[in-house]
C-alpha cells in the first residue's frame, strides 16, 4: 500500500531538529519528521559508517501501520516473510502447546505481521530519510548537549544549535544519563541475568533434511520453551535464510562495557543439550567462529522523557526485552507520534507543549509494553515442575481463546498493541486543544 502524502508542517522551514543515533528509533524519528516536510533534520551517528547488522526482527501490525505512514513498508515486503502464525512448543519433544493463527491480523487491525532482516529494515528507513532530505553525519561522537539552549557538541567540531534534540542513542544513552543526573537521579540499566545467542542459517544448509526444510518453508514463528530458556525461530529474506535467537540464563556476559562476549559453539550446544532433535540439528549448523552472546538488560520506567529542548526516544526512553516483538515497533511509534505533533505546531512557542503531549501519549503505552515483555519472559522460562505444567495447560487453553501466558500470542494484548493507530491518536489529541 502506497503511503498517503502527509500534510506539510507549518514550521517545516523554521525548526532545526537534531537526532542523536542512527538506529531504528533515530531513523524512524528522522523519517517521521522529513515526511512531514521538515527541512532541517540532522542525524548524528557515532559509528564511522552504516552497515548491515543484526539478525531477524518481527514487524508487528502496529509497526506495519507506522512504516506505511512513512512510505517504507512497500520497500520491505520483497525481502520479508509474511507470518501465517506462531507455534509454542515444548523444548524436549517438540510437542505443540499452542498454535496461534495470524489470519485475523489484517482483517482486525488493517495490517499483517512480517519478519525481516534487521539490516533490510534499517536500510529502508535510512534510504527513505535521505531521500526526503534528512542529513546523516557519521563519525559524530557527541561530547555534550546543552538542555536549555539545544546545543550539540560533536567531537572536533563547533557547537550546533537545534530547536529540539531527539536522543535516540539506545539503552546506553549518555544523554539520558545527563538528563537523570540533572534531576538528581542515578541512571542504571538492570542486568536480567539473561543473555541471547543469535544464529542465521542459509537455505542451502537446511534443504537436505526434510524437517529443517519444513521449518524454512513454513511462514510460522516457533517458540521452543524450556527451563530458564526459550528459543524463537522463523524464516527471513523471503525464505532464503532462517533466524534463530535464544534467551537463556547466563553469567558469562554483561560485565564488559559492550555487554557482549565471543561465544563458543560447543558451549551453546552443551547449554541446549537434551532439547529436541530438530532444533539441535539447526544449532549444529551454526557457523563456527561467528557466535556472539549478548547480555539482556532493561531500565526501570523513567520519571520523564523531556528536559527543556531534549527528548528521549526508543531504547533510550524504554529499553525492553524482545519477548513480545515490540522494541522496534515502539520506537517506530515514538518517531511517528513526535513527527505528527511537531508538525501541528504553528509557532516555536508551541513546541514545548508538543513535546509534553508526546510524553503523555507515548510513555504509558511504551512502559506497559516493556512490562508485558518482562512477564512473558518469566512465563516462558519456568523450570520443569508443577508450575510449568500449569503454564503448559494455560498455553493449550489459549488456543481456544483464553488468556495466554505468552503475551505475544494473547488476543487481548494483541488488541491493545495492534488496534491503536498512534498517528491518528496524536492528530486527534492535538486538535482537541
Task: Name the predicted role of every residue range.
Residues 19-36, 44-47, 166-167, 233, ...:
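Conserved mid-domain beta->alpha element of the FAD-binding
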Residues 31, 35, 41, 48, ...:
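Preference for well-ordered, secondary-structure-rich cores of eukaryotic proteins
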Residues 53-128:
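Active-site-adjacent segment of FAD-dependent monooxygenases/related oxidoreductases
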Residues 3-14, 18, 78, 88, ...:
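C-terminal helical "tail/cap" subdomain of flavin- and related membrane-associated enzymes
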Residues 50-51, 174-175, 319-321:
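Catalytic P-loop NTPase motifs of RecA-like helicase/translocase cores
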Amino acid at each position: 500500500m502506497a503511503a498517503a502524502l502527509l500534510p506539510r508542517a507549518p514550521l517545516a522551514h523554521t525548526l532545526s531538529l537534531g537526532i542523536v543515533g542512527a538506529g531504528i528509533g533515530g531513523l524512524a524519528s528522522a523519517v517521521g519528521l522529513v515526511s512531514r516536510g521538515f527541512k532541517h533534520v540532522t542525524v548524528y551517528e557515532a559509528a564511522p559508517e552504516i552497515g548491515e547488522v543484526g539478525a531477524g526482527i518481527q514487524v508487528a501490525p502496529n509497526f506495519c501501520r507506522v512504516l506505511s505512514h512513512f512510505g517504507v513498508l512497500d520497500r520491505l515486503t520483497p525481502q520479508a516473510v509474511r507470518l501465517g502464525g506462531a507455534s509454542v512448543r515444548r523444548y524436549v519433544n517438540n510437542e505443540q502447546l499452542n498454535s496461534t493463527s495470524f489470519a485475523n491480523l489484517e482483517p482486525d487491525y488493517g495490517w499483517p505481521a512480517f519478519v525481516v532482516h534487521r539490516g533490510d529494515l534499517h536500510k529502508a528507513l535510512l534510504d527513505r530519510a535521505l531521500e526526503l532530505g534528512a542529513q546523516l553525519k557519521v563519525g559524530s561522537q557527541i561530547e555534550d548537549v546543552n538542555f536549555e539552549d539545544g546545543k550539540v557538541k560533536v567531537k572536533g567540531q563547533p557547537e550546533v544549535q537545534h530547536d529540539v534534540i531527539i536522543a535516540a542513542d539506545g539503552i546506553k544513552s549518555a544523554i539520558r544519563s545527563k538528563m537523570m543526573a540533572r534531576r538528581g537521579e542515578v541512571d542504571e540499566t538492570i542486568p536480567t541475568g539473561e543473555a541471547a545467542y543469535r544464529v542465521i542459517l542459509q537455505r542451502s544448509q537446511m534443504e537436505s533434511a526434510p524437517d529443517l526444510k519444513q521449518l524454512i518453508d513454513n511462514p510460522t514463528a516457533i517458540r521452543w520453551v524450556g527451563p530458564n530458556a526459550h528459543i524463537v525461530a522463523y524464516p527471513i529474506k523471503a525464505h532464503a535464510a532462517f533466524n534463530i535467537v535464544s534467551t537463556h540464563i547466563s553469567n558469562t556476559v554483561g560485565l564488559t562495557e559492550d555487554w557482549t562476549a565471543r561465544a563458543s559453539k560447543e558451549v551453546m550446544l552443551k547449554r541446549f543439550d537434551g532439547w529436541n532433535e530438530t532444533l539441535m540439528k539447526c544449532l549444529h549448523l551454526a557457523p563456527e567462529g561467528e557466535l556472539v552472546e549478548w547480555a539482556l538488560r532493561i531500565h526501570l520506567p523513567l520519571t520523564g522523557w523531556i528536559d527543556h529542548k531534549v527528548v528521549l526516544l526508543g531504547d533510550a526512553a524504554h529499553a525492553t526485552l524482545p519477548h513480545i516483538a515490540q522494541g522496534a515497533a515502539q520506537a517506530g511509534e515514538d518517531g511517528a507520534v513526535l513527527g505528527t505533533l511537531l508538525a501541528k505546531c504553528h509557532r516555536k512557542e508551541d513546541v514545548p507543549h508538543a513535546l509534553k503531549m508526546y510524553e503523555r501519549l507515548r510513555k504509558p503505552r511504551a512502559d506497559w509494553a516493556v512490562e508485558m515483555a518482562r512477564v512473558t519472559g518469566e512465563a516462558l522460562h519456568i523450570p520443569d515442575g508443577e508450575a510449568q505444567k500449569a503454564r503448559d495447560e494455560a498455553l493449550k487453553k489459549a488456543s481456544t481463546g483464553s488468556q495466554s501466558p505468552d503475551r505475544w500470542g494473547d488476543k487481548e494484548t494483541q488488541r491493545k498493541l495492534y488496534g491503536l493507530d498512534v498517528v491518528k491518536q496524536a492528530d486527534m489529541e492535538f486538535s482537541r486543544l
